[in-house]
Structure formats: structure tokens, C-alpha cells
């Protein structure tokens, strides 16, 4: 195992490339995603992914609100608030959370089941909660730049649009609206996120820390799929050696 560190200050172009190079660790390369995009996933595996990723979706606005709460710059907040509106919706746009619920219905899940979060695995909950808590506790620039996995997001959304309709004809096509919407939104968000990162990371320490923060976010996305792989591929859900029931803790412990 090697840990690559440098004592050299990157130019803005070099630093941007270093950030983009992290794409080799994006969860599009996880075996679970490869399985889904290659058409080898079962209905249960698709449903499990949608139900668990819903927990990620509903927490993104909380993450973004935490960033805004720590940010003293009005101009940045005016731009950043659009991310919350993208997910929560406004006026005639129902938002990404509603679009994800419709994806859930398109793959055969009951809306109430998704909203109950009873299918959310502990490992997924822990990973997502770690991300939100980081956004609450880190300085706003670092928390904002943890979102730079959006650099790689358009490719993963496009891959689903390109492959899923063929591989999974049983999925209602209306469910793909979320992926189509995120294609343009992610590109817009990347421009702002990169601008912040290149402005803030003007020392070796800041650049290296930001690369580590981006890796932290990549670790979260990968870990989410590791948990799903245990439950839905290896059929080793939590406590599988003693029960087939979903006995793990549910939402609302602190609410």
C-alpha cells in the first residue's frame, strides 16, 4: 500500500487534473455498479440500490444547508442554495427527491416503503451520516469541495440512461427522469465547485488536504455499495447468521 504525498505546489491546471485523476476511484467502477450497468442485476438488487440510495438523496439538502450555514459569503450562498432547490423542488419543479421516489415506483417499490427508510442498511446510514457530519463540522470551503465527485457524475448518469432501458425493460421509463435532470445540474455544480477549490487551495497543505477530502467522499460512495453487495449479492445482510429479519436500527434515533 502506497500513500502518495507531494511537497510541490500544483499550478491551478495541475491541481484540477489531480482532482480529476481521482475519478479512477469513482463508484462507477464498483462491482455492484458494473453488475447493474452490464445487465446482470436482479430486480431485488436494483430495488435494494434504489431504496438505499434514497437515504443519500434525502440527506444531500441537509449537507448543503450545513455548508450554507457555515458560509459567511452571500454570493456563494446565492449560488449554493440552488443545490437545495434542485433536490427539494420549487414551483412546478418537484425536485430530485420526488424524482427519486418516482424511480423507486418505476422499479416496483412502494412509495411508503421508500419513505419509511426501513430498507436502509446500517452501513449505508453510517456512511451517509459521516458525510453530513463532515459538512457540519468542516470549514465551508472544504465541505463544499467534498462535493467534487460531481466531476465524475455525468458519466454515471449517462451510463444508466444508455444501458438500463435495454437490460431492464420492466423498469417504467418515466423513472429515468432523475438521471436526465442531473446531467445538466451536475455540470453546472462542477463549475462552481472547481472555482471554489482552485481559489481556496493555494498552498501545498490545502491542496493535499482537499485531495484527501475528495478521497473521503469517494470512500463513502464505495462503502455504500460494499454494504449493498453484502446484503444483495452475497446475501449476507446484517445479522444473517441469526435471523432473516431486518432487525437493525431504524431512522429517528435523534429526532
Swiss-Prot record:
It comes from the Bacteria. Keywords: Oxidoreductase, PQQ biosynthesis. CDD domains: TenA_PqqC. Transmembrane segments: none annotated. GO terms for biological process: pyrroloquinoline quinone biosynthetic process; sulfur compound metabolic process. It catalyses: 6-(2-amino-2-carboxyethyl)-7,8-dioxo-1,2,3,4,7,8-hexahydroquinoline-2,4-dicarboxylate + 3 O2 = pyrroloquinoline quinone + 2 H2O2 + 2 H2O + H(+). Its EC number is 1.3.3.11. Pfam families: TENA_THI-4. Pathway: Cofactor biosynthesis; pyrroloquinoline quinone biosynthesis. The keyword Oxidoreductase applies. One of its GO terms (molecular function) is pyrroloquinoline-quinone synthase activity. InterPro entries: Haem_Oase-like_multi-hlx, PqqC, PqqC-like, Thiaminase-2/PQQC. Belongs to the PqqC family. Ring cyclization and eight-electron oxidation of 3a-(2-amino-2-carboxyethyl)-4,5-dioxo-4,5,6,7,8,9-hexahydroquinoline-7,9-dicarboxylic-acid to PQQ. This is Pyrroloquinoline-quinone synthase. It comes from Acinetobacter baylyi (strain ATCC 33305 / BD413 / ADP1). The lineage of its organism: Bacteria, Pseudomonadati, Pseudomonadota, Gammaproteobacteria, Moraxellales.
Amino acid at each position: 500500500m502506497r500513500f502518495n504525498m507531494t511537497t510541490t505546489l500544483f499550478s491551478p491546471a495541475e491541481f484540477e487534473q489531480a482532482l480529476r485523476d481521482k475519478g479512477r476511484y469513482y463508484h462507477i467502477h464498483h462491482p455492484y455498479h458494473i453488475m447493474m450497468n452490464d445487465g446482470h442485476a436482479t430486480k431485488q438488487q436494483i430495488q435494494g440500490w434504489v431504496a438505499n440510495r434514497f437515504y443519500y438523496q434525502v440527506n444531500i439538502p441537509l449537507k448543503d444547508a450545513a455548508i450554507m450555514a457555515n458560509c459567511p459569503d452571500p454570493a456563494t450562498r446565492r449560488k449554493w442554495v440552488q443545490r437545495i432547490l434542485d433536490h427539494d423542488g420549487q414551483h412546478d419543479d418537484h425536485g430530485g427527491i420526488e424524482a427519486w421516489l418516482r424511480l423507486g415506483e418505476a422499479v416496483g417499490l412502494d412509495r411508503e416503503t421508500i419513505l419509511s427508510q426501513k430498507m436502509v442498511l446500517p452501513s449505508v446510514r453510517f456512511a451517509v451520516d459521516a458525510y453530513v457530519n463532515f459538512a457540519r463540522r468542516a470549514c465551508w470551503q472544504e465541505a463544499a469541495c467534498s462535493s467534487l465527485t460531481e466531476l465524475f457524475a455525468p458519466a454515471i448518469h449517462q451510463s444508466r440512461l444508455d444501458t438500463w432501458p435495454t437490460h431492464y425493460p420492466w423498469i417504467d421509463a418515466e423513472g429515468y427522469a432523475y438521471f436526465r435532470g442531473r446531467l445538466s445540474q451536475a455540470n453546472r455544480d462542477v463549475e462552481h465547485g472547481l472555482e471554489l477549490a482552485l481559489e481556496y487551495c493555494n498552498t501545498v497543505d490545502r491542496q493535499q488536504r482537499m485531495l484527501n477530502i475528495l478521497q473521503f467522499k469517494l470512500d463513502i460512495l464505495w462503502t455504500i455499495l460494499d454494504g449493498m453487495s453484502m446484503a444483495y449479492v452475497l446475501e449476507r445482510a446484517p445479522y444473517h447468521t441469526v435471523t432473516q429479519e431486518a432487525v437493525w436500527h431504524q431512522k429517528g434515533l435523534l429526532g
